[in-house]
Amino acid sequence: MKTRIHKILADHGIGSRRGIELLIRQGKVLVNGKQASIGQLVNENDIFEVDGRFIKLNKKTPNNKRVLIYNKRVGEISSRKDPEHKKTIFDALPRLKSGRWVSIGRLDINTSGLILFTNDGVFANDLMHPSSSIEREYVARVHGQVTDEILKKLVNGVKLEDGLAKFTDVQSGRKGNTNQWFAMVIMEGRTREVRR
């Protein structure tokens, strides 16, 4: 049975449908040695090459979804490839027999915390999409005094360069002499949103 290339590769954890479409546009996806086209119909018996790597599809269990929780430390890079060729968290993940790990969100190099990974690109995209309404909880240390008025503004919304940002919940935690900890919940995952 023929299936669109985006779906079959996403179902086997190669990436999200949009990510696969971008790779196709960049000419980085081959089917049976020929450049793939967007919307192309394929089947699991075809030979796939993605970004210079041959991909073996698992015909028995295409929806053998795996999810992994990774505790990222400060200083680790959470993108798949680093321009300076430093190791990334993808290098520390267990090898998959087929497909690849897709991160569900990212944390910048100066942030530590849990990141989810899956081999199911559609599942990853569903979780990351704003319509999923999934809460993301962060804990941050803030230097200086944070007033109730500031906390109210954070819940009501603060205008950033890329639009309005707001926390759905902010809870104060442990206080020090010059800083205080806060637990914050947001419903989206924009770049460095909590830090900003």
Regions found by a protein language model. Give the residues of each.
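Basic, flexible Lys/Arg- and Gly-enriched helix-loop patches that mediate nucleic-acid binding at interfaces
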Residues: 1-196
